[in-house]
Amino acid sequence: MKKAFLIILSTLIFPLCVFANDKEDIMATFDKYVKDANSYSTNLPNYYIENAKIVRIVNKKQGGKKAVVIPFDRYLKELKGHSNLAKVVNYKNNYIDRKIEKIDNDYKLSATRVPRNDKTGLPAHFIFTKVGNSWKIKEESMTTNVQVFLTAK
């Protein structure tokens, strides 16, 4: 009886330990990502899976929101091109109120993104998936007030 109880208990506790370790690994990966992004590192593409989904939720000036999906190859080009300007103006994002939830085999990290001159912050989320022994961004979604995303091709 005691042995059966221990087996049942261990099958209940083990998944919780794995979940806790995954959350810690994802948070550590995200911290590195933010540090690299804020230092304009050229290795940012390494944090993403190939053809990751990139979404910008634009707060429209006339009211409402519009989701814009950016092709990953275009995102990489823009990332490379805009990093010099971001460096000149010392643009950085901070992420507060971070939460992680498990979604099937992936994890969703939700946070409030506080850009350089923003006072209130904007919603953001990243979906991480396991690739080999590391966690990669499968989807990135950020709310923005930048209107150019509405007309970008």
At which residue positions do the language-model features occur?
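A general lysine-centric signal
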Residues: K2-K3, K130
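Sec-dependent N-terminal signal peptides
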Residues: K3-F19
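Short, low-complexity N-terminal intrinsically disordered segments enriched in polar/charged residues
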Residues: L16-N46
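Exposed acidic/polar residues on beta-strands and adjacent loops within beta-sheet cores, strongest
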Residues: E24, D97-E101, K153
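Short, well-ordered alpha-helical segments enriched in acidic and aromatic residues
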Residues: Y40-V58
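Polyampholytic, low-complexity intrinsically disordered segments
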Residues: Q62-K65
